[in-house]
From Swiss-Prot:
Subcellular location per the Swiss-Prot or TrEMBL entry: Cytoplasm
CDD domains membership: TopoII_Trans_DNA_gyrase
GO CC annotations on file: cytoplasm
Entry protein name: DNA gyrase subunit B
Known role: A type II topoisomerase that negatively supercoils closed circular double-stranded (ds) DNA in an ATP-dependent manner to modulate DNA topology and maintain chromosomes in an underwound state. Negative supercoiling favors strand separation, and DNA replication, transcription, recombination and repair, all of which involve strand separation. Also able to catalyze the interconversion of other topological isomers of dsDNA rings, including catenanes and knotted rings. Type II topoisomerases break and join 2 DNA strands simultaneously in an ATP-dependent manner.
Catalysed reactions, semicolon-separated: ATP-dependent breakage, passage and rejoining of double-stranded DNA
Family classification: Belongs to the type II topoisomerase GyrB family.
InterPro entries: Ribosomal_Su5_D2-typ_SF (IPR020568), Ribsml_uS5_D2-typ_fold_subgr (IPR014721), Topo_IIA_B (IPR000565), Topo_IIA_bsu_dom2 (IPR013506)
Main location (coarse class): cytoplasm
UniProt source species: Rhodobacter capsulatus
Enzyme Commission numbers on file: 5.6.2.2
Chain segments annotated as transmembrane: none
Complexes and interactors: Heterotetramer, composed of two GyrA and two GyrB chains. In the heterotetramer, GyrA contains the active site tyrosine that forms a transient covalent intermediate with DNA, while GyrB binds cofactors and catalyzes ATP hydrolysis.
């Protein structure tokens, strides 16, 4: 519901958000996302309910997994070859609104303000969950 609220003034391009939740090696991962008709990407990353305005390893893992999954689908389905296009991460995230939340037992941040998550074990946890669920 939060992603719908964030996009209340935009036109959605899908009926319902995609929701993924799971735990990978003791790290809880929750993702809610959908696309709208804008060109702007909005991703709100959280660690243990604390927002990270500068992202971090959880955001890097999400972006990497999303790009790989969409690119693989485009190649496997023949869309990329038929339309003669190469997808990039920017293409995959255009119009995306996402709330990404991780629960980490002992998170590491780049500073005391907790603006950026730097715990290296979080990236593969997020990548694995997003790859599996998408």
């Amino acid at each position: 519901e939060f992603v719908k609220y964030l996009d209340r003034s935009k036109t959605a391009v899908m009926p319902d958000p995609i929701y993924m939740v799971g735990e990978v090696r003791g790290i809880g991962v929750e993702v809610a996302m959908w696309w709208n008709d804008s060109y702007h990407e909005t991703v709100l990353p959280f660690t243990n309910n604390i927002p990270q305005r500068d992202g971090g390893t959880h955001l890097a893992g999400f972006r990497g997994a999303l790009t790989r999954t969409i690119t693989k689908y485009a190649q496997d389905s023949g869309i990329a070859k038929r339309e003669k296009i190469d997808f990039t991460g920017d293409d995959a995230r255009e119009g995306l609104t996402c709330v990404l939340s991780v629960k980490v037992p002992d998170p590491k941040f780049s500073s005391q303000t907790k603006d950026k998550l730097v715990s290296s074990e979080v990236r593969p946890a997020v990548e694995n969950l997003v790859n599996e669920k998408l």
